[in-house]
Amino acid sequence: MPGLFAAKKLKDNRQNFRWKDTQYKRKTLGLNIKADPLEGSPQARGIVIEKVGIEAKQPNSAIRKCVRVQLIKNGKQITAFAPGDGAIGFIDEHDEVMIEGIGGPSGRSMGDIPGVRWKVTKVNNVALSEMVSGKIEKPVR
């Protein structure tokens, strides 16, 4: 046991050893926000550059329909998944889309789609899910 007046030494040691913890270090230095294309925000708008098909990981065999999007706020390019049956048909190049996280573990990719961490929620300010279900038609810009 340390001495009677050793509280400062104990506290300083704890603080120094916390820097060995990866999660603490990343949080304190803001490394996760620096590396995040959305810069810490929950959603972002972007312009569709191209449509891409991404092969699902084993044991599944499918081509997941995704889009390459250039974010308006910082110009970074990301790949976003288009959820829903036939959803890719409602998205054209140069459309403005709203992107949000796909909901995977620890903010990472979900399921069998490798390297895709975002999904498309709106196309030209209209919900993609509404267009897929047939409730709303895509507006002509």
UniProtKB/Swiss-Prot annotation:
It comes from the Archaea. PROSITE patterns: RIBOSOMAL_S12. Coiled coil: none annotated. GO terms for cellular component: small ribosomal subunit. Keywords: Ribonucleoprotein, Ribosomal protein, RNA-binding, rRNA-binding. GO terms for molecular function: rRNA binding; structural constituent of ribosome. CDD domains: Ribosomal_S23. InterPro entries: NA-bd_OB-fold, Ribosomal_uS12, Ribosomal_uS12_arc, Ribosomal_uS12_euk/arc. GO terms for biological process: translation. Part of the 30S ribosomal subunit. Belongs to the universal ribosomal protein uS12 family. With S4 and S5 plays an important role in translational accuracy. Located at the interface of the 30S and 50S subunits. PANTHER family: 30S RIBOSOMAL PROTEIN S12 FAMILY MEMBER. This is Small ribosomal subunit protein uS12. It comes from Methanosphaera stadtmanae (strain ATCC 43021 / DSM 3091 / JCM 11832 / MCB-3). The gene is rps12.
